[in-house]
């Protein structure tokens, strides 16, 4: 599935092929722009970070087709993953079009704290498909803030109310994209 950590060895065992074959196939998907690997950010000093990359398809439609999804229920897990994928692809497009030479990564600790996207050391972004955000949605961002590295901590959601609290911003997804393309979060 798109946006999931990819374990080359497990995938190779499931397919009964050598791990090098899986690595080559994933490389082929990247070369043909069908998908890309999002590396894990491992510079965390306070919490041990997972080092496994995530794989994203270039388009949520590919993910839906492979999953056999004809309609997307707003309350489904796939809807949330698709929304995350959409925001991730917008960030990736922004970095490419603006020729920003910043690392694009994600962070996950061994204790399960996670932040969906990191742009260099400037911006940490958590994506939630919910229409009403809560303090619980900031868990990963708050854990990452303890590192004192990133300048912006942003929760992107479908909640139309934009808020700011103690260096954290909760932004409606359209506002986030407007601000992203206006260069407000990155170099």
Language model region names:
Residues 130, 135-149, 153:
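Short, charged, amphipathic alpha-helix that recurs within catalytic cores of restriction-modification
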Residues 124, 154-155:
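Structural beta-sheet core signal
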Residues 59, 113-114, 136-139, 147, ...:
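Nucleic-acid endonuclease domains
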Residues 114-115, 133-136, 161-165:
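Short active-site-adjacent structural elements
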Residues 108, 155-157:
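Short beta-strand/turn micro-motifs composed of small residues
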Residues 160-187:
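Domain-level recognition of nuclease-like catalytic cores that cleave nucleotide substrates
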Residues 1-123:
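Accessory nucleic acid-recognition modules appended to NTPase machines
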Residues 120-133:
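Active-site ExK catalytic segment of metal-dependent nucleases
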